[in-house]
Curated annotation (Swiss-Prot):
Taxonomic source organism: Calycanthus floridus var. glaucus (Eastern sweetshrub)
Protein name: Photosystem II reaction center protein Z
Bilayer topology term: Multi-pass membrane protein
Function as written in the Swiss-Prot or TrEMBL entry: May control the interaction of photosystem II (PSII) cores with the light-harvesting antenna, regulates electron flow through the 2 photosystem reaction centers. PSII is a light-driven water plastoquinone oxidoreductase, using light energy to abstract electrons from H(2)O, generating a proton gradient subsequently used for ATP formation.
Similarity comment: Belongs to the PsbZ family.
Length: 62
């Protein structure tokens, strides 16, 4: 169970880092938002899902 928690936290950190870099690049590029809107929404949905997964796993471990 601890390994699953650690992997979920690592995935959350990796997703956060990727979104931290990619979202400003998408907004700064011309026509970037209209072309990459689905990618940004998918990444944000993945991030929200990982936050809930980490919270659930944390409550099971503690």
């Amino acid at each position: 169970m601890i390994i699953a928690f650690q992997l979920a936290v690592f995935a959350l950190i990796a997703t956060s880092s990727i979104l931290l870099i990619s979202v400003p690049v998408v907004f700064a590029s011309p026509d970037g938002w209209s072309n990459n809107k689905n990618v940004v929404f998918s990444g944000t949905s993945l991030w929200i899902g990982l936050v809930f997964l980490v919270a659930i796993l944390n409550s099971l471990i503690s």
